[in-house]
């Protein structure tokens, strides 16, 4: 798994070629396996649980026994402790002390999309359609209007990045490749997940 790559296959996911020309937060892009080796801990485990990249730093500090509390530096600015981090240590999960540390995860493509993923559902909120709102639901992408259009199965360098007209809701239990948008069939679930997403982003104070 790497950053600059495109999904392989025969197009069975139905979302076109991706790379950097489309802000798709679909499963084939955001579901990234995490491999860890921690000296002194038994290996060979496969754990099915939600984690995020922000969990890496607290995990490493925990493994090095460097967890610490915030304090006053004595120079007029605070020294932040590990409890101030957005992430959580994965060691309790690795040791089998807990079954999960998160009920959901979020993903996104700067200025274009946010998504929230639970065990059963995946909700995608497309941002550019809300570009007139100056809040966390929108961020302009400079130069996007000058980019040239392209077909779904091409990936022209510098192509205009467009998003769907409405948000997406997928049932992860029955729709592995996220091809059947059920947002009109389950509007209550969509509203619930969008609310969870907004609350979480608001807590992060993220733009």
Where are these regions (language model features)?
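Histidine-centered active-site microenvironments of extracellular/periplasmic hydrolases
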Residues: 1-42, 47-52
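Short beta-strand segments
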Residues: 1-2, 35-36, 104-109, 124-125
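Generic structural signal for small/hydrophobic residues in well-ordered secondary structure
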Residues: 3, 33-34, 56, 90, ...
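Polar, surface-exposed loop/tail segments
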Residues: 6, 44-118, 192-195
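Short, P/G- and charge-enriched loop/turn segments at secondary-structure junctions
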Residues: 17-25, 101-103, 152-158
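C-terminal, low-complexity/hydrophilic appendages and adjacent surface loops
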Residues: 27, 108-183
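Short, solvent-exposed loop/helix junctions and linker helices
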Residues: 29, 47-54, 84, 163-166, ...
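Charge-dense polyanion-binding interfaces
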Residues: 192-207
